[in-house]
């Protein structure tokens, strides 16, 4: 690969006259002025440009999306409006649905050009096709530009025989054969906008202003301050802080997990990438440029861009699969016979499982809208194949409600992967809801922060308070079973049962395929940076060592060896994924002393 500079591509400012285009730029995910080629296309040769965001108040009132994500979105829109004001323009927030709004705007504003960022997700493609048809019938030119992903996803699929790659290793092999991602374009400036200003009415805020949470029907009483401030301005500040860690960029050394790792970081970027407040291409090339500067012009490895590439991998897998977020009709998803257990699901979602590590994570998620990626792994494993044996589809819905950075592709893809429903995850890997947290934060400060009921427990018992003597519970002013729930399951028993369930499922899949999947089960021991299980422990919250220690998994480990089948997926894989697996016996209820 040839080296690429981080300098944004220069976009010439074309002369604009009175007979130029009347443009509307439709903001959706790309809520920024930097690296926004579709917005630049709206400006080019135009006499008037209006920047529009369409918000459906009915959707806001009826949507399952939680208040933290709505707050982040509204903050991002406010920030965008503030930036546009500096260019003598404004953001037009239009109420309604696109199919109803655009015919009126086309006529009322005399629109001749509509621009927007390409949306790779199935729902977005369907919506945009309808709008493009409508615009064509109205004589409106439509310009779309790709800037939400690094690569052309259709090109990746084409290189893979017209099918999406279903392992990360295969995905990496494909993109290594492609050209580098396009460089980011420069930000829209006052020079771009000086001759194409839209008329702003005095009552703009009343008609087109960004609404408040209260106006959208959200109760804000008791709502704490935002841990994550939405908007492009904040995103760029965070990017600078993120890249100040030169040693990390040079060596790609991940800091060891500790209690502080679990808290929201001022350098975190995932919600900003999800809403497009930060360009993934700008992030990519800023990383690239800094690595080459520190490493004296060495070409950076793909592993440096792991956060971005895993995102890209899931976008590629989802782009042509409208059933990507569910089991039924999803050709890549193994049809595992999960249990229906609404009571257990509710306790998990509300942070009332009786396992302080799991409950603290879910409480942080509900309060702040974010949790560390390894915390996501822990609660996803607990809900699905680890303990509760509840479908990953339920986890997708809860995360979609609560998680700031949740989107269709990455959220559903991560849940399928972590539940061993797709992407060749190793099912022997199981997170211990006691040992993992204890190894990460031995003092238990994270639990005390989010579960103040347990703050009086000594560190010895805070991860398994059910084992604390009655005198310790009384001293902590928290009686287990009264003030804090008993464990919902006996982890040691249920996790062993669930591993057997998965083992039988994969054996059936192997027989159907005519091959044995056991060749892909790791037989070596990899040094783990982060604890997964506690082999040999006799505690109620741990799993015994029944075999070789599992490999670390997922985006957390750039050195992970994906030793599962790596051939390009074909029709055989689709057939295998649709096999109906024999129903396994329901898990036994937890023992009274669990």
From Swiss-Prot:
Q: Which UniProt keywords apply?
A: Biological rhythms, Chromophore, Cytoplasm, FAD, Flavoprotein, Isopeptide bond, Nucleotide-binding, Nucleus, Phosphoprotein, Photoreceptor protein, Receptor, Repressor, Sensory transduction, Transcription, Transcription regulation, Ubl conjugation
Quote the PTM field.
Phosphorylation on Ser-265 by MAPK is important for the inhibition of CLOCK-BMAL1-mediated transcriptional activity. Phosphorylation by CSKNe requires interaction with PER1 or PER2. Phosphorylated in a circadian manner at Ser-553 and Ser-557 in the suprachiasmatic nucleus (SCN) and liver. Phosphorylation at Ser-557 by DYRK1A promotes subsequent phosphorylation at Ser-553 by GSK3-beta: the two-step phosphorylation at the neighboring Ser residues leads to its proteasomal degradation.
Q: Where in the cell is it found?
A: Cytoplasm; Nucleus
- UniProt xrefs under PROSITE patterns: PHR_CRY_ALPHA_BETA (PS51645)
Residues that hold FAD according to the record: 270, 307, 373, 405-407
Provide one Gene Ontology biological process annotation.
regulation of circadian rhythm
Q: How does it assemble?
A: Component of the circadian core oscillator, which includes the CRY proteins, CLOCK or NPAS2, BMAL1 or BMAL2, CSNK1D and/or CSNK1E, TIMELESS, and the PER proteins. Interacts with TIMELESS. Interacts directly with PER1, PER2 and PER3; interaction with PER2 inhibits its ubiquitination and vice versa. Interacts with CLOCK-BMAL1. Interacts with CLOCK. Interacts with BMAL1. Interacts with NFIL3. Interacts with FBXL3 and FBXL21. FBXL3, PER2 and the cofactor FAD compete for overlapping binding sites. FBXL3 cannot bind CRY2 that interacts already with PER2 or that contains bound FAD.
Q: What is this protein called?
A: Cryptochrome-2
Protein species of origin: Rattus norvegicus (Rat)
This chain is encoded by the gene named: Cry2
């Amino acid at each position: 690969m040839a080296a690429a500079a981080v300098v944004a591509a220069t976009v010439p400012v074309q002369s604009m006259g009175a007979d130029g285009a009347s443009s509307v730029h439709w903001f959706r995910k790309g809520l920024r002025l930097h690296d926004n080629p579709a917005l630049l296309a709206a400006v080019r040769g135009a006499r008037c440009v209006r920047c529009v965001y369409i918000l459906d108040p009915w959707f806001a009132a009826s949507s399952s999306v939680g208040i933290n994500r709505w707050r982040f979105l509204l903050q991002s829109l406010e920030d965008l409006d503030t930036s546009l004001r500096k260019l003598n323009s404004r953001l037009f927030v239009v109420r309604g649905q696109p199919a109803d709004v655009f015919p009126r705007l086309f006529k009322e504003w005399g629109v001749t050009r509509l621009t927007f960022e390409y949306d790779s997700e199935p729902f977005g493609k369907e919506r945009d096709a309808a709008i493009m048809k409508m615009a064509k019938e109205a004589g409106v030119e439509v310009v779309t530009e790709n800037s939400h992903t690094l690569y052309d996803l259709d090109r990746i699929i084409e290189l893979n025989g017209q099918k999406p790659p279903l392992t990360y290793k295969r995905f990496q092999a494909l993109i290594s054969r492609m050209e580098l991602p396009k460089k980011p374009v420069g930000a829209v400036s006052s020079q771009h906008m000086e001759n194409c200003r839209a008329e702003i009415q005095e009552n703009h805020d009343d008609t087109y202003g960004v609404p408040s949470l209260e106006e959208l029907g959200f109760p804000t009483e008791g709502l704490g301050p935002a841990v994550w401030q939405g908007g492009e301005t904040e995103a760029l500040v965070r990017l600078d802080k993120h890249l100040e860690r030169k040693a990390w960029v040079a060596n790609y050394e991940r800091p060891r997990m500790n209690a502080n790792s679990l808290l929201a970081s001022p350098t975190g970027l995932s919600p900003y990438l999800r809403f497009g407040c930060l360009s993934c291409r700008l992030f990519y090339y800023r990383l690239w440029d800094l690595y080459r500067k520190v490493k004296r012009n060495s070409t950076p490895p793909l592993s440096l861009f792991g956060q971005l590439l895993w995102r890209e991998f899931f976008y590629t897998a989802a782009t042509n699969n409208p059933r990507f977020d569910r089991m039924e009709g999803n050709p890549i998803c193994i049809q595992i016979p999960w249990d229906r257990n609404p009571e257990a699901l509710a306790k998990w979602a509300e942070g009332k499982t009786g396992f302080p590590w799991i409950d603290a994570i879910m409480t942080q998620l509900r309060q702040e809208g974010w949790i560390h990626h390894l915390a996501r792994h822990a609660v996803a494993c607990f809900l699905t194949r680890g303990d509760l044996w509840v479908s990953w589809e339920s986890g997708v819905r809860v995360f979609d409600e609560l998680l700031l950075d949740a989107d269709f592709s990455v959220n559903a893809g991560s849940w399928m992967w972590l539940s061993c429903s797709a992407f060749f995850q190793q099912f022997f890997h199981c997170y211990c809801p006691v040992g993992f947290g204890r190894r990460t934060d031995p003092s238990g400060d994270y639990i005390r922060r989010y579960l103040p009921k347990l703050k009086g427990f000594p560190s010895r018992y805070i991860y398994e308070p059910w084992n604390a003597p009655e005198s310790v519970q009384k001293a902590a002013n928290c009686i287990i079973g009264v003030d804090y729930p008993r464990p919902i399951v006996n982890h040691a028993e249920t996790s062993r049962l669930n591993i057997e369930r998965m083992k039988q499922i994969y054996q059936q899949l192997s027989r159907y395929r005519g091959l044995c999947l056991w060749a892909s089960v790791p037989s070596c021991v990899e040094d783990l940076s982060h604890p997964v299980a506690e082999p040999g422990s006799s505690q109620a919250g741990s799993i015994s060592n029944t075999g070789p220690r599992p490999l670390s998994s997922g985006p957390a480990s750039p050195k992970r060896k994906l030793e599962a089948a790596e051939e390009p997926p074909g029709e055989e894989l689709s057939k295998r994924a649709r096999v109906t697996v024999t129903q396994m016996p329901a898990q036994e209820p937890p023992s009274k002393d669990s």
